[in-house]
Amino acid sequence: MDLNLFRYRWDGDKYQLHYTVSQLAPYAAIRDWIRAGLDLHFRKDHRVLETIISIFFILGSLVSTLAGASTEYQAINCRKHSAVLTDFGGVGDGKTSNTKAFKAAIAELSQYASDGGAQLIVPPGRWLTGSFNLSSHFTLFLHKDAVLLASQDEAEWPAFPPLPSYGVGRDEHAGRFSSLIFGTHLTDVVVTGNNGTIDGQGAVWWDKFHQKKLKLTRPYLIEFLYSDQVQISNLTLINSPSWNVHPTYCSNVLIQWLTILAPVDSPNTDGINPDSSSNVRIEDSFVVSGDDCIAVKSGWDEYGIKFGRPTQHLVIRRFTCISPDSATIALGSEMSGGIQDVRAEDITALGTQSGVRIKTAVGRGAYVKDIFVRRMTLKTMKYAFWMTGSYGSHPDTGYDPKALPEIKRISYKDIVAENVTYSARLEGIENDPFTGICISNVNISLTQKPMELQWNCTDIQGVSSKVTPQPCSALPEKSIECPFPEDRLPIDDVKLQTCSASG
């Protein structure tokens, strides 16, 4: 597949997304690339497949080309000092390990943190590397023809203990491998480019997962812990071993202009997972994934309850998802630190299992509340709405069966869904109902063979207005418009600077 299909162009004062007729040639390649996975779900219904692929042309905002070899980029801060990976012995032949070169470069450049900061430029080439850690007041910049290739040698991936809010590793309880691009306790860190590529070469990890040969939990592509002022932007991420982007215990996080691609049958290749983080903005991005395109998290059962750090003040806008077995935006299921004040708007999903899905269970505790969604366009979906109070497993037997999650004030409005099998599956918890659900101005058109029961509702309470098909009796019709906050969050006011990676 020609990854140049997905490009953003700097137009002087902001990124714009473009495509031209000459770029339609990759259409067949993309179609074939996705078909292998989608055919498993759509029974070789190429009419459905063509509808899904039409996203690349219907939404010009997702198909573009960066102008030439421009070295300008947008960042939260520019850097006074600059170096190129080849200055530290980097070899971009796709075979030579560059882990030592990355570590040497970052160690050298980190000394400028208090003197205007530094940037490391990754030039054109194929740069094989294992895990490496970034530093504060630092920018990693990938040239448009640069490809970072994640090493498949486990020796290049240090072992870490489990995250404290999870208690155990997700794949294997013993712990986890470090992420490819990693950092902890950082301030002002940027990973960007003019749409360079990070290739996780995940197939070997997916095979180990399926064959139960993993000793530790698989690595992620980009992960920051306990960090503030984080930017991840204008990159293409492909074939991650597991999750792609994972800001955890972070604040003031800006994620934008990402293209994330993985086979739709690849295990746990979530796109963007904000985890126990606050003041986060995700926008102008596109994900094809084997799992949730965005999964909002905050810790697992008793470990998340004890750690007690919520994900809150999260903005998601202008986001597109393809994921046949998962959600466009998932809340949970690991939500034991709480999730509050999520604002999602202008969301598109094609060939995806569900729009916004709330996932929780007895033992999770905490809350999911003040969730606001508006202006969603959904095509070829199993569910338009899905909430479940019986999702997922527990890390161990130490969870508290009396720890019931509180799910309330959930607002959906201005949604159009086409070719839908079930309108809604809304399942709360016995003696712990999900309350304050509001659904308004929603039009759902059904597949040719819809399920007879369109609204399956148990242990929920709420209202609806102008919804087709008619909702269940637990959502009685009222003359209301569901709320959506009109105030701005601090992350909305973050201004970007025009920087140079001329090296």
Language-model regions: role of each:
Residues D2-D13, H18, P26-G503:
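Extracellular/periplasmic carbohydrate-active domains that bind, remodel
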